[in-house]
Structure formats: structure tokens, C-alpha cells
Amino acid sequence: MKTTKTTFTIVSALASVILLTSCGSNTTKTQETKASSTKNQVTMTYDQQRSQENTMSVLWYQKAAETKALYLQGYNVATDRLKEILQTPSDKPYSIVLDLDETVLDNSPYQVQNVKDGTAFNPKDWDVWVKKATAKAVPGAKDFLQYADQNGVQIYYISDRTTSQVDDTIKNLEKEGIPVQGRDHLMFLEDGVKSKEGRRQAVQEKTNLWGQPSRLCRLL
């Protein structure tokens, strides 16, 4: 899962004006002070608005019945479709690829902490969260993936988590009852590699790859 950090900065042009007119009238200084105060108020209002928006988004994700319903619907559709596909024999084993964050694992507690701290995503805090291995499975993911595993489907997790986070991620998945078919089935981000497409192609070369069911579960 990645979060875009937005930085909003207002640079006051009044600073140079105040220096140049330090010998001016008290009226001018008063006007400049009021203008500077107004700009500070704009900054606070914007920051407060952004914080409120982030809070509402996280609360909706965690509490809204629609969130659970959408995940369950997506994974139910994926399960039905997989059942149909498995009726057709294949020389290669069938496989599926999924992302992890917000597709299999729910990282909203990490987002909640960011809201409380007034911070955005950063790699250091994210790594601390991953090491806790406490993310819960999103609704429907466990049943779908267990069905796939029990029916001989190869499951690959293609994620932009780093390779140093593989062990903690395996620990988290196993705690949630999510099938892990080997370390080589967790295809994480390596130095110099950004695109997931190359990893998908590597899976496709040795298996009969069935798309990416996570697309059915994506919340739009």
C-alpha cells in the first residue's frame, strides 16, 4: 500500500517588505501585521481541513458497512470465476497474483496513527508497522485464498513492500490464516526494480496465470 505526501507551504512576501519599511508609519506596520496574521490563518485552516479529510476517510474505511460489503462482493465474484476456470484442464498449474496492502491486508490502523500524529506516510514508520505483523485480513480474502490453495492454485503476492520485510509479512499472513506457499511466492520490491509487470511476467512464464482478482476487490 502507498500514500502520497502533500506539502502545502505559504511563503510570506511580507517579510522583505517589513525589513524595507521598518522606519515607516505605524499604520503601515499594523496593516502588514494583519496581512501576515491572515496568511497564517489560511495555513491553519488548510491544515485543519486536510486533517479532517484524512480522519473522515480512515473512519469511513474502518466503519462503513459498504467497505466490508464491497470486499466480500469482490472476493465472492472472484471465487465463482475461479471455480469456472478450474473446470478446464491445464498443462501448467493455474496461478493468481495479488497485491497485499488493502487487497489482502488491512493497514488502516497505521493510517489512524498517522492521523493522530498529524503525519503522512514515511518509510521508517511504515517499516515499524510492518514489523508488528498485526494487520488483519480484509473481508473475504482468507476464504478466497484458502479455496485457491486447496484447489492447487499457485498464489503469488506481488507487492511494493521491500525484500527486507518478507519475514514479517509471512508472519502476519500466517497469523491471519492466509496461505503462504513459499518465500518465492512473495515477490517484493528489489533495488532498481519499480514495475510490477516484470514480476507478473515471471509468474506467467511458468504457470497458467489468471489475471489479478484483486481488481475485482478494488474500492473505487
Give names to the regions the model predicted.
Residues 27-37, 44-48, 162-220:
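C-terminal cap/substrate-recognition subdomain and adjoining C-terminal extension
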Residues 128-155:
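Short, acidic loop-to-helix structural element flanking the phosphoryl-transfer center
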Residues 92-94, 149-156, 180-185, 204-206:
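Loop/turn elements at helix/coil->beta-strand transitions in domains of secreted/extracellular proteins
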Residues 60-71, 127-134, 156-162, 187-190:
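Second-shell loop/turn segments in exported
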Residues 83, 87, 109-110, 146-154, ...:
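Sec-exported extracytoplasmic/periplasmic mature domains
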Residues 111-137:
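Metal-dependent phosphoesterase signature
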Residues 2-14, 20-98:
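Non-catalytic pre-domain segments flanking phosphatase-related domains
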